Amino acid sequence: MIKDNNTSKAITQATHQETLQKYDVKFTVNGKECNVKVKANQPLRDVLRRKLGLTSIKDMCGGQGACGSCTVIMNGRPILSCSTLAVDCDGAVIETAEGLADSNHPLVDTYVMNWTAQCGYCTPGFILTAKALLDHNPNPTVDDIKEALGGNICRCGNYHVHIKAIQEAGQKIRERK
């Protein structure tokens, strides 16, 4: 095969130009409409943290999608914001821990009452995953909770307390109905 260096160079330059190009993206975060310019390869995590100042979104695994600390809720489902391109979020409804903290959701109280956070690094990802679960199933079994939390890592090994807090929040949700 004959390699054409000029063609190779042109493709590389075109690809590089595409990643530098900025796109207008509009989405709703914690009930507020946001308009941002993003690069094609920019993760949602970086946009939320750096452009919008929402620092509950963490990065424990270096953007590998392996820890759950960057979890947000998008259109009702938990997603890893480190592996979701911001350009793909146009029109989305996004919830972060900052939005949950301002609500009267039972998870906020049960997480505090159970001393769920030790170092606190994983807490936003866990609590948003739990909220998405409880929004769809307010009476989850322990196995349901474990399955939902399967993508979240707690460096302190505090898993049993997360489960207890989620069960108690589910009970409070069921009592409200």
What is each model feature region?
Residues 2-177:
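Signature of N-terminal electron-transfer/Fe-S-associated modules in redox systems
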